[in-house]
Amino acid sequence: MAKESIQAIKEALLTVTDATDERLASWREDERSGVQQAIKQWERRQLAKEKEWQLFKEMSQFEEAAYKKGHRLIAGIDEVGRGPLAGPVVTAAVILPKDCQLLGLNDSKKLSAKKRETLYNQIQEQAVAIGLGIADQGVIDQINIYQATKQAMKMAIDDLAFTPDYLLIDAMQLDVPQPQESLIKGDARSISIAAASIIAKVTRDRLMEEYDELYPGYGFKNNAGYGTKEHLLGLEKYGVTPIHRRTFAPIKDMI
């Protein structure tokens, strides 16, 4: 009887989810290096999935605690863009379903752009509700970045299709009627806040890509408005744009 081709085994391994699968024992006895390499790749994938599951469970603890208290619509809230010299601060509020199984959720800054996009789409498909809040540079200059962030977070809550009955917020306290919990580094500790972080990050990055076309020469699509060398050189060469924050150094010294 002819042996299975290496390609056939590779494809079959993509369907194997259990280490007790009898086929694994058979393939492990196959002396072909291509088969052994494929098994090692499968083992690495399994280990990565196990780590993702463990992280997911750890990051679900705050949601589980809120469910046990009787809450049902738990919103995670986060912001992106407090530090840049240009562009808005973007906030998101996300209510995930109780049986959510979005593996890979983490602080958006720890994820690759490709992974963020994948998770962004999955969150859009699975979330109970998503709300966005945006405070532009005019608001930031008028009331300061801290207050602008709070204002944008409230906007994100109001933008939700359903009113949440509990809030998990990344390092912020809000003057709202719902009970809330402020978590330092919450985007790496709560699946709901992590989801909000990803929605806010992808939304803001897309906005900055549009601004890059509108105001070329500052590298907005690469630096998202942060004060990189390319951005600072652009300021020296082309001056201040309408999306720059005039109360932030060095812009305030240039006008």
UniProtKB/Swiss-Prot annotation:
Primary localization: cytoplasm
Superkingdom of source: Bacteria
Gene source species: Enterococcus faecalis (strain ATCC 700802 / V583)
One cellular-component annotation, GO: cytoplasm
Subcellular location(s) per record: Cytoplasm
Catalytic activity: Endonucleolytic cleavage to 5'-phosphomonoester
Name used for this protein in its record: Ribonuclease HII
Keywords from the named record: Cytoplasm, Endonuclease, Hydrolase, Manganese, Metal-binding, Nuclease
Matches recorded under NCBIfam families: PRK00015.1-1 (NF000594), PRK00015.1-3 (NF000595)
Protein encoded by which gene: rnhB
GO MF assignments: manganese ion binding; RNA binding; RNA-DNA hybrid ribonuclease activity
GO-annotated biological processes: DNA replication, removal of RNA primer; mismatch repair
EC numbers on record: 3.1.26.4
Function: Endonuclease that specifically degrades the RNA of RNA-DNA hybrids.
